[in-house]
């Protein structure tokens, strides 16, 4: 689960990471009031779940409250397009009005899971204020790493990183404290990503999290009811939100071949084979091993709500989800939803013959794939 910058900063502040003074604004009047409260020049920052906001025109500096009001009028309600939003962009519905700070240097701090080690890794770099992926690709030597152990970064690791990215001796303790606090927040909140970019050093030697991003492990949210309340459904794809209500794992993609599969591994393999056959998947949809006919019907309804879908591939290996259960749900969906796109079905496993018989006797013109490759070729041809 993603949250907004201002929400991430509020969490970091609870763990004693220094953040600039700021206020969230939902209206133009809120923005003006916030700017007056802060006094002096302020930064007006669009709040969406995507990076690259500055380059897209979503971050502007105002010299006073009057200019902040004018900027708020322009940014609130705009569709902000960045390299992470795609061409459709995101509607800006809230702003962060924040004090400006005298920046001496921009640095980077971040924590992600190292899948090779199976442990979180703390990264720090002197190249802050830019995409860390670009830094990693072009100048990987600028990224320093320390493996994390519970409950967080040790004092010697924090100081090592602080000195390593060129923090002056007078500011090392403050920077190390912020790093340690960030690592503790990561552990305590069951985060999958915690990032401060840029982490700044001011002209008077202080450090601040000038921007912050935290992503949480969805599977751990049951332990953090307070985090669930931070979820902004307006920032999520409506179909993905609807799928989550029915216990379905759905991610919308840009292709034309709709996919319904049981099991994440088989779902990814299905998308791969569709690409290999010359097509493009419209979604990732894992109905899970324990799905019933009603869930299958809901999955179909969600899948077909995407009007870019020109054909559907159902790829099921019957285990806990028996093939006859899947077929019953598919037929029910076809009857209730007035399906107009061609459907290719490939089933193997428990009760496969019964499942095929249900499809055969349904009266609908389902295309049967002999195997995955045959099914992929057929569905790509039908979607063309």
UniProtKB/Swiss-Prot annotation:
Its EC number is 6.2.1.5. It comes from the Bacteria. Substrate binds at residues 262, 319-321. One of its GO terms (cellular component) is succinate-CoA ligase complex. Heterotetramer of two alpha and two beta subunits. The keyword Ligase applies. Mg(2+) binds at residues 197, 211. ATP binds at residues 45, 52-54, 98, 101, 106. This is Succinate--CoA ligase [ADP-forming] subunit beta. Its cofactor is Mg(2+). PANTHER family: SUCCINATE--COA LIGASE [GDP-FORMING] SUBUNIT BETA, MITOCHONDRIAL, SUCCINYL-COA SYNTHETASE BETA CHAIN. Residues 9-242 form the ATP-grasp domain. Belongs to the succinate/malate CoA ligase beta subunit family. NCBIfam families: PRK00696.1, sucCoAbeta. GO terms for molecular function: ATP binding; magnesium ion binding; succinate-CoA ligase (ADP-forming) activity; succinate-CoA ligase (GDP-forming) activity. Binds 1 Mg(2+) ion per subunit. The keyword Ligase applies. It holds the Pfam family ATP-grasp_2. GO terms for biological process: succinyl-CoA metabolic process; tricarboxylic acid cycle. It comes from Solibacter usitatus (strain Ellin6076). Succinyl-CoA synthetase functions in the citric acid cycle (TCA), coupling the hydrolysis of succinyl-CoA to the synthesis of either ATP or GTP and thus represents the only step of substrate-level phosphorylation in the TCA. The beta subunit provides nucleotide specificity of the enzyme and binds the substrate succinate, while the binding sites for coenzyme A and phosphate are found in the alpha subunit. The gene is sucC. Keywords: ATP-binding, Ligase, Magnesium, Metal-binding, Nucleotide-binding, Tricarboxylic acid cycle. Pathway: Carbohydrate metabolism; tricarboxylic acid cycle; succinate from succinyl-CoA (ligase route): step 1/1. It catalyses: succinate + ATP + CoA = succinyl-CoA + ADP + phosphate; GTP + succinate + CoA = succinyl-CoA + GDP + phosphate.
């Amino acid at each position: 689960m993603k949250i907004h910058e201002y929400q991430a900063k509020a969490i970091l502040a609870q763990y004693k990471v220094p953040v600039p003074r700021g206020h969230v604004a939902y209206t133009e009047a809120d923005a003006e009031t916030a700017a007056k409260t802060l006094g002096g020049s302020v930064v007006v920052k669009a709040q969406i779940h995507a990076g690259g906001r500055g380059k897209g025109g979503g971050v502007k500096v105002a010299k006073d409250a009057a200019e902040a009001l004018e900027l708020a009028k322009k940014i609130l309600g705009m569709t902000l397009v960045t390299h992470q939003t795609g061409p459709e962009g995101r509607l800006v519905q809230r702003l962060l009005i924040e004090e400006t700070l005298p920046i001496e240097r921009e640095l980077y701090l971040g924590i992600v899971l190292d899948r090779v080690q199976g442990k979180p890794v703390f990264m720090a770099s002197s190249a802050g204020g830019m995409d860390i992926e670009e830094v990693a690709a072009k100048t990987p030597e600028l990224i320093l790493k320390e493996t994390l152990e519970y409950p967080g970064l040790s004092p010697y690791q924090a100081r090592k990183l602080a000195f390593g990215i060129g923090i002056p001796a007078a500011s090392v303790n403050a920077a190390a404290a912020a790093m340690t606090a960030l690592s503790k927040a990561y552990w305590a909140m069951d985060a999958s990503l915690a990032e401060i970019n840029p982490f700044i050093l001011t002209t008077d030697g202080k450090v601040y999290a000038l921007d912050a991003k935290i992503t949480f492990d969805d599977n751990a949210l049951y332990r953090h009811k307070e985090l669930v309340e931070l979820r902004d459904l307006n920032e999520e794809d409506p179909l993905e939100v609807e799928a989550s209500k029915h216990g379905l794992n759905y991610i919308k993609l840009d292709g034309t071949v709709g996919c319904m599969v049981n099991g994440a591994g088989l779902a990814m393999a299905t998308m791969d084979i569709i690409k290999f056959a010359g097509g493009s998947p419209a979604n990732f949809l894992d109905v899970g091993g324990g799905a019933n006919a009603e869930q299958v019907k809901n999955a179909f309804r969600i899948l077909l709500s995407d009007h870019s879908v020109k054909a559907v591939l159902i790829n099921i290996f019957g285990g806990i989800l028996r093939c006859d259960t899947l077929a019953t749900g598919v037929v029910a969906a076809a009857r209730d939803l007035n399906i107009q796109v061609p459907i290719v079905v490939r089933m193997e496993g428990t009760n496969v013959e019964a499942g095929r018989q249900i499809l055969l006797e349904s009266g609908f013109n389902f295309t049967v794939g002999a195997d995955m490759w045959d099914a992929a070729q057929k569905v790509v041809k039908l979607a063309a």
